[in-house]
Design a protein with these regions (language model features):
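Zinc-dependent metallopeptidase catalytic helix centered on the HExxH motif
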Residues: 128-144
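Hydrophobic/aromatic ligand-binding patch that stacks against planar heteroaromatic rings
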Residues: 123-124, 154
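Short acidic active-site motifs
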Residues: 120
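Hydrophobic/aromatic residues within transmembrane alpha-helices
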Residues: 124-125, 228
Length: 289
């Protein structure tokens, strides 16, 4: 037994030290990542940048901030807007679209569909100088949807009743405790149709398509990349390398130097994502998907 203790004693001490000083070691690791020497080739000023839109669009604050920063950065000569998103909420999608529109007036922007560029994420991309899509990607779904649930049957079985005091005929619109009334559906449809008109008109203007023929490219059609090109929703098929090469040509840079995301920022984003909590209301969201 004493022999085993002597053999494993150094290992036990090491593990005990790591356990007692984990936070300090993590802090030192973060300091090293922040101040570690930069390779010589990274000391050159970046002249191109990739901005990514991935996942459902629920909030555009960080992405729009990133786009605005690049817009004002004179050292960045062109932007690759990489998209893989099924769409999302209307207002954030519009915010991103108009941020890209402002950016494209100052420097070339290539939007690249790596997997899905549909609904709100397609809206976000329409003002890019060119849209390149992976041959296996899905494009389109230009439409608007609002949906909710009717829990009245379950509530009745559980003996739950809703009590409401309201001012305004439409104030209870979208409630989940009873079927929606015809006048409520009509009111919601008014909003949906107006939003769809805005969406399809912006697409027509940005892509130079005939708005009167919007049923051919909108109407929530889902297209392959090749089909999307035929109806005018994208410019070319290609992989990410293709999109980057086109951006290099449009930006006029002699040597492409891509701006890499800071290592510390990557770590903090992962930590934030793992601890994020999402709150939702019962009111049915208006989404582009």
């Amino acid at each position: 037994m004493e022999l085993l203790k002597k053999i494993f004693s150094p290992l036990a001490k090491t593990l005990n030290y790591i356990q007692n000083h984990f936070k300090a070691m993590l802090f030192l690791l973060l300091l090293f990542l922040l101040f570690a020497p930069t390779p010589k080739d990274e000391l050159n000023t970046p002249n191109l940048q990739e901005i990514k839109l991935t996942g459902a669009i629920m909030d555009a604050t960080d992405l729009v901030k990133q786009i605005n920063q690049v817009t004002q950065d004179n050292t960045i000569k062109g932007v690759l807007f990489s998209v893989d998103s099924p769409g999302g909420a209307v207002a954030p999608s519009v915010e991103i679209a108009y941020a890209i529109k402002r950016l494209s007036k100052i420097k070339p922007v290539i939007a690249y569909a790596s997997g899905t560029m549909a609904s709100g994420s397609y809206y976000a991309s329409i003002w890019a100088d060119k849209i390149i899509a992976n041959p296996g990607s899905m494009i389109g779904s230009i439409g608007v949807i609002m949906q909710g649930s009717d829990f009245s049957g379950i509530m009745q079985k559980l003996g739950i009743k809703t009590q409401v005091v309201k001012a305004g005929k439409y104030k209870q619109i979208g409630t989940p405790d009873r079927p929606w009334k015809n006048y409520e559906v009509k009111e919601l449809n008014k909003v949906i149709q107006a939003t769809y008109d805005m969406f399809s008109r912006d697409v027509a203007n940005a892509r130079k398509l005939d708005y009167k023929k919007r049923d051919t490219f909108a109407n929530a059609h889902i297209f392959t990349a090749l089909q999307a090109k035929k109806v005018g929703l994208i410019d070319n098929l290609g992989v990410k390398y293709t999109a980057k090469e086109i951006l290099v040509q449009l930006s006029g840079v002699k040597e492409a130097r891509w701006n890499q995301e800071d290592t510390f920022d990557k770590i903090m984003k992962k930590i934030s994502a793992s601890t994020a909590i999402v709150f939702q209301t019962y009111f049915p969201p208006l989404t582009l998907r």
